[in-house]
Amino acid sequence: MYLTKEEEQILNGEAGETLRQAIQILVALGDIYGADRLIPIKSAQIAGVSYKTIGDAGLEWISDLEGQVKVPAILNPAGMDLEDWERLRISPEFAEKQKEIVQAYKKLGIRCECTCTPYTLEGFSVSYGDHLAWSESSAISYANSVIGARTNREGGPSALSAALLGKTANYGFHLDKNRVPEVSVSVECSLKESDYGALGYVAGKLIGNRVPIFQLRSKPEKDELKSLGAAMAASGAVALYHVKGVTPEACRMDFEEPEEKIIIERSQLDEVYESKGKEPELITIGCPHCSAAELKKAAELLKGKTVSKETWIFTSRELAERYPEYIRTIEESGAKVVCDTCMVVSPATNSYSCVMVNSGKAFAYVPGMCGAQSVYGNMEACINKATGGKERKAGDSH
């Protein structure tokens, strides 16, 4: 792997121990995957933020690092709402450790808006062809597929290393040859809303880590593409997909039709909706974090109603502050709008035995990461389950 003179000096420790560790990680990955050199990146998105997932060892490692990131960098969701952690019954001990983790990242110059949808934030723009070092699976999929940027599935340490250096190793999805579709997926039904999450859950299991190209009967919105990619990244390991006539590379590139073809039928999606579980104790929406359009829809569905089950709606703090009217309407129902975290990486979910989700990603992750059953429905079904379809009465305390 070719290194410039400056990069060799960094590897030799002449720029300090933190940068030596960082370039050592990237060079090791580059050697494993056959990278020819390091390339500059536009931004980094760093996983390994929740105390639930990284523990004391992770906190100690991050705290020992020095210096400042060279490119815009942002954090993945933490293990709690950083401003209102008590209402989800997070312990003070966990909260203290979580705050230490965020502060350790902040001292490195990293933006501490903890979200899995960084592409929605002001001042964190991503464009077609940009090279990135992102590490949250749904954000990787969105950047690669919906925007046409280029990032591998970075781990937390490699994304942080890339942020500190402003570079990453040139392999994988940074190269044209690895962005070519490997399997064609034909969907034999029209889709809307959470159907795309169900499709992603089914397709990910069939595709694994390959690059699919979809032939769809419906034209998906960006939130639906977000759901599709997030679910495929969770049930499989898909980091890049194409949709004929929709996603940018499928529109710009003249891809050859893959030899392998998969057909997915409505009955396979119905199996996701019909998954059996206990009566849900918790309703969760926003995995990945809700967009403005999704917050608006949740507010419309909850207006004038009262939830009778614990209901959490996750979004980024920036969007929650940008749309206070949606947040107010949602919370008047008794539902909680939660920022900085999600149902998967927060320990708060662990006290429930069955969780209803409108996300194929959460449907895949909740059983393994939270020890709960997951049942699936669209946003309207989730809110109907939360409210029992009941209108809020005059004088209701919510």
From Swiss-Prot:
Catalysis performed (reactions): (R)-5-phosphomevalonate = (2E)-3-methyl-5-phosphooxypent-2-enoate + H2O
InterPro entries according to UniProt: PMDh-L-like_dom (IPR007506)
Textual note on the cofactor: Binds 1 [4Fe-4S] cluster per subunit.
A Pfam family hit: AcnX
Binding-site list for (R)-5-phosphomevalonate: G48, V49, S50, N76, P77, E136, S137, K361
Entry keywords, A to Z: 4Fe-4S, Iron, Iron-sulfur, Isoprene biosynthesis, Lyase, Metal-binding
Root EC class: lyase
Pathway: Isoprenoid biosynthesis; isopentenyl diphosphate biosynthesis via mevalonate pathway
GO molecular function, one term: metal ion binding
UniProt keyword annotation of Metal-binding present: yes
Entry EC number(s): 4.2.1.182
Key word Amino-acid biosynthesis present: no
Cofactor(s) this protein requires: [4Fe-4S] cluster
GO annotation terms (biological process): isoprenoid biosynthetic process
Binding-site residues, [4Fe-4S] cluster: C116, C287, C342
Record-stated family: Belongs to the AcnX type II large subunit family.
Complexes and interactors: Heterodimer composed of a large subunit (PMDh-L) and a small subunit (PMDh-S).
Role: Component of a hydro-lyase that catalyzes the dehydration of mevalonate 5-phosphate (MVA5P) to form trans-anhydromevalonate 5-phosphate (tAHMP). Involved in the archaeal mevalonate (MVA) pathway, which provides fundamental precursors for isoprenoid biosynthesis, such as isopentenyl diphosphate (IPP) and dimethylallyl diphosphate (DMAPP).
Protein name per the record: Phosphomevalonate dehydratase large subunit
Organism: Methanosarcina mazei (strain ATCC BAA-159 / DSM 3647 / Goe1 / Go1 / JCM 11833 / OCM 88)
